[in-house]
Design a protein with these regions (language model features):
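Extracytoplasmic beta-rich repeat domains
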Residues: 131-158, 184-200, 223-254, 279-295, ...
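Short loop/turn segments that connect beta-strands within beta-propeller blades
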Residues: 177-181, 217-220, 271-274, 312-316, ...
Length: 494
């Protein structure tokens, strides 16, 4: 990993070298003063300092353009096609994608990056460092079995007893034998099923993409009931970037009641036996996160306006609401009196549970945090989107124990076993993509984060995705993964 922790007052030799070189590295005669290459660092709230570089040039039409070099984000001399605004007086702005504000003072370029206003300090340089060679890992185990789901999926498999349950983009919901991958039953719905199912004693519950809560007989796969959770609307979609919003809220089953969020901005309580809506709490914004439980009576969930809500399920009263700067699609978790949640403002947050005050922030640079943390033995394990790492973090201090590149979009919850951490990754092949991703499954050493092996997925189709978007599941000593290629597979957990 390229990041490193440096005390605030510590000398930065890299910048000192840039300063010595700057005497002979001024802008060419007649050029805009900002033109050329700038190298330096960017600093995150947790104290992490990473190498960062910008290069500015004029295009044929005269517009000021830039390239970015940000190794920690796997971004190498990337052109994003976003114009640079010259505000005069040495001030420049790159918005809205990066919220990058810069001030040019001689051979120094400083400013802030992103909504969190991360400090950037640059000096003139000659060229970006060379791109590192791709990492080569030992191949992982071959699948023990493979089941054809009939369509790809964004949803994670759920293991209950000897069975695996999951939905697909085609609206198919499968029950599969975990031992040999044979079909037990398949139910066909009218809409895609992108969310995680919850399994009760005799019923499986899942939300489809049109905000219908579906209850299926666990043994036969027949429909028991369907409850629309969209109060007069035909379903709701996340408000921005629909390419990456293939998700539905995860229900919580508790004491005969299914609690589930909806894109209509409500948190619903539904009778698990009949499908009757018992009540709806207006959360004020679409709810695509899962519902977590604190103690015996407090529900926890996130909203697309950046809120994290704690709700007394008996009194139906909010006991705490804290705000982040972006949509929250992760399920909140609590450890050591700290409420932990990821946000689309590129931050993983820790809030003091007692009063909602900030405890810590962990920056993912300009990567959404869509991975719900796995809390195991006093550590949380979290994936990332473009940051493409699994990170083990102390939930009380917010300090990383280790952080390992996995080279793909990592949206699911890491699967943690006694010795290993397994994660699925996604490759995207969308027009305009500047960050290369790899789809597959990786195994890491739980203690150190060192990579053990990698199973590569088929390449992503044009304007599509490849790999494994949902969390992995554990069935005995096998890892279960469901892919965009329509295959459900089992791998030996080694």
């Amino acid at each position: 990993m390229h990041t490193r922790s440096i005390p605030t007052a510590a000398a930065r030799p890299l910048l000192a070298l840039f300063a010595l070189a700057a005497v002979s590295l001024g802008a060419p005669a007649g050029a805009d003063p900002i033109e050329g290459t700038w190298l330096g660092t960017i600093t995150a709230p947790q104290g992490t300092v990473a190498d960062f570089g910008l290069e500015f040039h004029r295009e044929k039409g005269g517009a000021l353009a830039f390239k970015m070099n940000f190794p920690d984000m796997f971004t190498y001399a990337a052109e994003f096609g976003i114009p640079v605004e010259d505000e005069g007086g040495g001030r420049y702005r790159i918005t809205p994608a990066f919220d990058l504000e810069l001030l040019l003072e001689g051979d120094r370029l400083s400013g802030t990056f992103g909504k969190a206003r991360l400090p950037v300090a640059l000096a003139r340089g000659r060229a970006f460092p060379p791109r590192p060679a791709p990492q080569r890992l030992p191949p992982g185990p071959a699948p023990l079995w493979s089941y054809d789901m009939g369509a790809g999926t964004w949803a994670p498999p759920v293991v209950a007893g000897t069975m695996i349950y999951l939905g697909t983009k085609a609206g198919l919901f499968h029950a599969v034998n975990a031992g040999d991958g044979t079909a037990v039953w398949t139910w066909k719905g009218a809409n895609p099923i992108d969310g995680r199912a919850v399994v009760g004693p005799g019923t499986v519950y899942v939300l489809d993409t049109r905000e219908n809560l579906i209850a299926l007989d666990r043994a036969r796969g027949s429909l028991r009931w369907l409850a629309p959770l969209h109060e007069g609307i035909a379903g709701a979609k996340a408000p921005d970037n629909p390419t990456f919003n293939h998700r539905s809220a995860t229900p919580l089953l508790l004491d005969g009641v299914v609690y589930c969020g909806s894109g209509d901005g409500g948190l619903y309580a539904v009778d698990a036996a009949t499908g009757s809506v018992l009540w709806r709490h207006d959360a004020g914004a679409p709810v695509y996160s899962g519902v977590g439980l604190l103690g015996a009576g407090t529900l926890m969930f996130g909203t697309m306006d950046g809120s994290v809500v704690l709700l007394d399920r008996q009194a139906r009263r909010e006991t705490l609401r804290v705000r982040t700067g972006g949509g929250v699609v992760t399920t909140p978790v609590v450890a050591g009196g700290i409420l932990i949640v990821g946000s689309r403002d590129y931050m993983l947050y820790g809030f003091n549970l007692a009063d909602g005050s900030p405890a810590w922030r962990f920056s993912y640079w300009f990567s959404w945090v869509e991975s719900t943390p796995a809390l195991v033995d006093g550590l949380i394990y979290v994936g990332a989107s473009d940051f493409s790492r699994v990170t083990a973090i102390d939930p009380v201090t917010g300090k990383a124990r280790w952080s390992t590149p996995v080279h793909g979009l990592d949206w699911g919850t890491p699967l943690v076993t006694r010795d290993s951490v397994f994660t699925g990754t996604v490759a995207q092949n969308m027009e305009g993509t500047v960050i290369a991703h790899v789809g597959g499954i990786m195994a890491l050493d739980r203690l150190t984060g060192a990579p053990r092996w990698q199973v590569l997925a088929a390449a992503a189709p044009e304007n599509g995705f490849g790999g494994y978007a949902g969390s992995l599941a554990l069935a005995g000593d096998t890892v279960i993964a469901a892919g965009f290629d329509g295959k459900l597979i089992a791998l030996r957990a080694r």
